[in-house]
């Protein structure tokens, strides 16, 4: 395919095709597994600051030469060590917020405060044992290093006749996981991510003066950096958007009311009735897609995938073109196929992750739901 589209974009496109084709969106929360899987007996964790204590943390800036005739007015890149104390606190708070471990203890004072030079130093097994014993925990997650790269730019936005001042900071935290019984770290993580700020002004100087100050930027970047490794360490809830067909027949409209009341079983009965009660392929496709969403909400991901595949096959017949056989096919040619295929791809990804997620959540004895509607979940598009 020459182009790819998001589920939301395809939905907006479909809405423009006709008012009779009613779509509503719902927000859902679903659990995604972490990259790491911890043994179920590890219930208590300490988050520690294992970085050098560097008192001088000035930004080291390099300014680029700007070519004439471009919208870019200025651009400079700066490098700095991030604030490890703030990042360690943020890391501990974010892990505690996920409610995965029974207890999260923080030790944000630098373990290597006496270091003369910035360096990474892996904790020895004896140090890990002593820390775990003194803090009363089963294992250690340590922030080992934090580097920041900040890019500041001012450019003219011709379409808005104004200037934009932007700061884009890329954070590079290094995190190690230590178990007392191991002589070496269980793993080392080197994630990275970006945080962005922007301001606007009538002149380049005005836009530049409104930009976030360095001190605030460094603090907020350190807080953000602490959250970056968390998805690699513990399962996390992710927000998603799903779309339901709500028009075309009385059962479909009534089912939409049940969804707003969170009565999914009643909605399913009407969607199934709509699917079985018609030979119209478009109506069957819409009902099938809704039933797929129903099964996803019930955590029956295999059934959800089965119904999404039915919807996809019907969409292929409706659009009268096999998208996989033509590199020239676009959303204009196969809008229904795009919508069903994008949703099916999301379900396949969730299904592939499910065994790992179940393994990671097996430490909890109670019955868990991996999918749930977000508060105020139904919103008409």
Task: Go through the PLM ranges and name each one.
Residues 1-7:
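Bacterial N-terminal signal peptides that target proteins for export
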Residues 20-42, 178-287, 291, 297-369:
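C-terminal/domain-edge helix-coil "capping" segments
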Residues 21-30, 34-46, 52, 58-67, ...:
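N-terminal intrinsically disordered, low-complexity regulatory tails that precede a folded domain
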Residues 42-51, 122-159, 173-175:
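A short, hydrophobic beta-strand-centered structural micro-motif
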Residues 51-142, 182-187, 320-323, 328-364:
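N-terminal segment of the mature soluble domain
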Residues 142-205:
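Amphipathic beta-strand/beta-sheet edge segments enriched in Tyr/Trp
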Residues 370-375:
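Conserved small/polar residues in nucleotide/adenosyl-binding loops
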């Amino acid at each position: 395919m020459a182009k790819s589209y998001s589920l939301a974009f395809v939905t907006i496109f479909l809405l423009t095709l006709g008012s009779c084709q009613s779509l509503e969106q719902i927000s859902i929360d679903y659990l995604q597994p972490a990259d790491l899987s911890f043994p179920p007996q590890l219930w208590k964790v300490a988050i520690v600051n294992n970085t050098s204590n560097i008192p001088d943390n000035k930004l080291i800036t390099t300014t680029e030469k700007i070519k004439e005739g471009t919208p870019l007015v200025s651009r400079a890149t700066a490098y700095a060590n991030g604030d490890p104390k703030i990042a360690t606190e943020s890391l501990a708070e974010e892990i505690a917020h996920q409610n995965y471990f029974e207890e999260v203890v923080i030790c944000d004072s630098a373990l290597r405060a006496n270091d003369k030079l910035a360096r990474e130093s892996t904790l020895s097994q004896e140090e890990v044992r002593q820390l775990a014993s003194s803090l009363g925990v089963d294992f250690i997650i340590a922030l080992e290093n934090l580097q920041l790269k900040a890019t500041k730019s001012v450019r003219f936005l011709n379409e808005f006749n104004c200037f934009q001042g932007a700061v884009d900071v890329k954070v590079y935290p290094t995190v190690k996981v230590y178990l007392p019984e191991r002589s070496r770290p269980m793993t080392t993580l080197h994630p990275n991510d970006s945080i962005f700020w922007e301001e606007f002004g009538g002149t380049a100087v005005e836009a530049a003066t409104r930009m976030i100050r360095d001190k605030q930027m460094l603090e907020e970047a350190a807080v953000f950096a602490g959250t970056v490794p968390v998805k690699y360490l513990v399962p996390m809830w992710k927000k998603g958007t799903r779309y339901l067909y709500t028009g075309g027949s009385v059962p479909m409209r009534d089912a939409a009311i049940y969804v707003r009341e969170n009565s999914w079983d009643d909605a399913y009965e009407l969607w199934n009735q709509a699917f079985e009660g018609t030979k119209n392929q478009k109506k069957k496709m819409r009902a099938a897609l809704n039933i797929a969403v129903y099964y996803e909400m019930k955590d029956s991901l295999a059934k959800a995938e089965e119904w999404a595949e039915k919807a996809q096959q019907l969409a292929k017949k409706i659009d009268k073109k096999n998208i996989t056989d033509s590199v020239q096919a676009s959303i204009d040619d196969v809008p229904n196929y795009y919508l069903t295929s994008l949703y099916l791809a999301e379900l396949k990804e969730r299904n592939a992750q499910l065994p790992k997620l179940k393994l990671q959540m097996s430490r909890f004895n109670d019955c868990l739901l991996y999918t749930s509607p977000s508060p105020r979940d139904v919103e008409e598009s």
